[in-house]
């Protein structure tokens, strides 16, 4: 597959950087790490080497959503087949001096807006440990870190990670949450539709209709 094929396939739905972020994460969520290096190569040819850290960070950020094993396999596939154009540095090193718990809480509240407390109470009623891990780790240390991938790009990445898993309750919140982080309705629906098509290509069977705006 060439970058022209990818761009023709999803012609005009998203700008190239966002398209490639959504694509690698959707394939990773579908457990198709074999697709990752080809897309990363296309992205570097079309956008330039600067997209490589974004693709790597998008996959890192997807880890609490799709699971560490799939993320590890996808990143290994990418880095093994495409030598990183820049040294791999610990991007979150500066977080040692930041209250990531507070940062995660702010990010969580911006994502869910007026339904923040309802979402939090729902998680807490299921498991206090789960709620704290979600806020402190997933949101605090991972999703709210914006030095490489922006909040808007993170929101599109989350949609791409959730669609293949057929988890409408979570997808519903993040479709709306993406709007709160600056995405347009068209961008949100494009990320959803691209991830949905990739899921079908990978043989994912859905129980019913996938959530929409």
Curated annotation (Swiss-Prot):
Pfam families: CMD (PF02627). The keyword Cytoplasm applies. The keyword Nucleotide-binding does not apply. One of its GO terms (biological process) is cellular oxidant detoxification. GO terms for cellular component: cytosol; mitochondrion; nucleus; peroxisomal matrix. InterPro entries: AhpD-like, CMD-like, PTS1_Protein. It is found in: Peroxisome matrix; Cytoplasm, Cytosol; Nucleus. A motif (Peroxisomal target signal 1 (PTS1)) lies at residues 211-213. Gene3D superfamilies: AhpD-like. One of its GO terms (molecular function) is peroxiredoxin activity. Keywords: Cytoplasm, Nucleus, Peroxisome. Probably involved in peroxisome formation or maintenance as well as in amino acid metabolism. Belongs to the PXP2 family. Peroxisomal targeting signal 1 (PTS1) is a tripeptide located at the C-terminus of more than 95% of all peroxisomal matrix proteins. The prototypical PTS1 is the terminal tripeptide SKL (serine-lysine-leucine) but the consensus of PTS1 is defined as [S/A/H/C/E/P/Q/V] [K/R/H/Q] [L/F]. However, this description of the PTS1 consensus must probably be expanded beyond the terminal tripeptide. This is Peroxisomal protein 2. The lineage of its organism: Eukaryota, Fungi, Dikarya, Ascomycota, Taphrinomycotina.
